[in-house]
From Swiss-Prot:
Entry protein name: ATP synthase subunit beta, plastid
Membrane topology designation: Peripheral membrane protein
Single GO molecular function: ATP hydrolysis activity
Gene Ontology cellular component terms for the protein in this record: chloroplast thylakoid membrane; mitochondrion; proton-transporting ATP synthase complex
Similarity field: Belongs to the ATPase alpha/beta chains family.
Length: 494
């Protein structure tokens, strides 16, 4: 029988707990002996009691029951200073983390402890990180578009409400800015919130993201309850147990906003490959036989237990955007291959577009979405998207000829195609709200209907007489005329 999750999760007093002692320590793995009949359950949190009545200092999670009243647990923090014989307390529950509005604007570790030096989190609501996926009867199976207000995404690779999106992009192509704009737009358009799970990435990147979020207003440090995001970090310097579970901590916080607050939630996981990598390390430490390419034999199960909890229910939705690192650019590697099976859309960021100064640098030809079907998005959206892709594809094919022979050697039709493709390419750029402080241009949220209308007018030749620069970094197509007239006036006054 599936139990309804309880968010007022009470962690009982530590003195009433079952007690054991450490018998073996191998790196981040502890073997703990308990009295007969006092064994903890799988996934229970164990706390190593410090010597001389000090505070408990290391939390572990039970992974295996070994027999002879012993369990094997994986530590969530460094095991430096632990010794055989130290007392271990079974908390009687899985790792439980704070949930609710008080988590917004704060940074947490895998245990739900704030690490931003802003004091304790004021909440009594805790939730265990291990839960079942929502039952089928509670799922919302309607296929609906999750409008982001970002033109290139909504038109060519739309996100599914409650779906999963893979975000592919190297360093310096605008991944962080795109993530922050999505966080900002979901808060404005849907009254939703976001949870960011930093899984096994660099500490410096996590710090930079936090600073940029404060600068752009996504995190309001004066009024934390007005912040739009909660951050959960398990960086690459932390033990594999923490990196393996930090994604579940972030997901648990997101589930509360969906199930209790009935909100639409954006869940960012950066990087989903590191989740698999940490699971592989833990699997080896526990002595399991490795599977293909050295990965854990439970790879599909672990990925499924995380991904199946990310879904839409009748209360709200969790839409997940997951950065995917592809080792050695090998898409057949078991880690990315297992991830792809769960994705509804892919957003690919292009370095060549970023080099041209076109932001967001989303590649319109490489980005894909299962939602781009006429029976889901409608005939007009589908046909416009296909015509845009065909025009951009033809432009891509002609680029080599243009580079060698020049534009004058093309036929009239091809010259017209190139001109319209360059205008579409620039029209799909957009000023972001979170980049206002850097660019000085006010951000634009563009509805899907306006994006379709704009691209249709460009393709039909309505704007063939306007310079392509007028299409750069505008919101709706109506702004193009105004920008062109302004440029004309400037040139005239010169």
């Amino acid at each position: 029988m599936r139990l309804t999750p309880n968010y007022d999760y009470e962690v009982s007093s530590i003195n009433k707990k079952k007690r054991g002692y450490i018998v073996q320590i191998i790196g981040p793995v502890l073997d703990v002996a308990f009295s007969p009949g006092m064994m903890p359950s799988i996934y229970n949190a164990l706390v190593v009691q410090g010597r001389h009545n000090q505070e408990p200092n290391v939390t572990c999670e039970v992974q295996q029951l070994l027999g002879n009243n012993r369990v094997r647990a994986v530590a969530m923090s460094d095991t430096d200073g632990l010794m055989r014989g130290m007392e271990v307390i079974d908390t009687g529950t899985p790792i439980s983390v704070p949930v609710g509005g008080s988590t917004l604007g704060r940074i947490f570790n895998v245990l739900g402890e704030p690490v931003d030096q802003l004091g304790p989190v004021e909440t009594n609501q805790l939730s265990p990180i291990h839960r079942s996926a929502p039952p089928f009867l509670k799922l919302d199976t309607r296929l609906s578009i999750f409008e982001t207000g970002i033109k290139v995404v909504d038109l060519l690779a739309p996100y599914r409400r409650g779906g999963k999106v893979g975000l592919f992009g190297g360093a310096g192509v605008g991944k962080t800015v795109l993530i922050m704009e999505l966080i900002n737009n979901i808060a404005k358009a849907y009254g939703g919130v976001s949870v960011f799970g930093g899984v096994g990435e660099r500490t410096r990147e996590g710090n930079d993201l936090y600073m940029e979020m404060k600068e752009s207003g996504v995190i309001n440090q004066q009024k934390l309850d007005e912040s739009k995001v909660a951050l959960v970090y398990g960086q690459m310097n932390e033990p594999p147990g923490a990196r393996m579970r930090v994604g579940l901590t972030a997901l648990t916080m997101a589930e509360y906003f969906r199930d209790v607050n009935r909100q639409d939630v954006l869940l960012f996981i950066d990087n989903i490959f590191r989740f698999v990598q940490a699971g592989s390390e833990v699997s080896a430490l526990l002595g399991r036989m490795p599977s293909a390419v050295g990965y854990q034999p439970t790879l599909s199960t672990e990925m499924g237990s995380l991904q199946e909890r990310i879904t839409s229910t009748k209360e709200g939705s969790i839409t997940s955007i997951q950065a995917v690192y592809v080792p050695a650019d090998d898409l057949t590697d078991p880690a990315p291959a297992t991830t792809f099976a769960h994705l509804d859309a892919t957003t690919v960021l292009s370095r060549s577009l970023a080099a041209k100064g076109i932001y967001p640098a989303v590649d319109p030809l490489d980005s894909t979405s299962m939602m781009l079907q006429p029976q889901i998005v409608g005939e007009q959206h589908y046909k416009t998207a296909q015509r845009v892709k065909q025009t951009l594809q033809r432009y891509k094919e002609l680029q080599d000829i243009i580079a060698i022979l020049g534009l004058d050697e093309l036929s009239d039709d091809d010259r017209l195609t190139v001109a319209r493709a360059r205008k579409i390419e620039r029209f799909l750029s957009q000023p972001f709200f979170v980049a206002e402080i850097f660019t000085g241009s006010p951000g634009k949220y563009v509805s899907l209907a306006e994006t379709i209308r704009g691209c249709t007018l460009i393709l039909s030749g309505e704007f063939d007489d306007l310079p392509e620069q007028a299409f750069y970094l505008v919101g709706t197509i109506d702004e193009v005329n105004a920008k062109a007239m302004l440029e004309e006036e400037k040139n005239f006054t010169k």
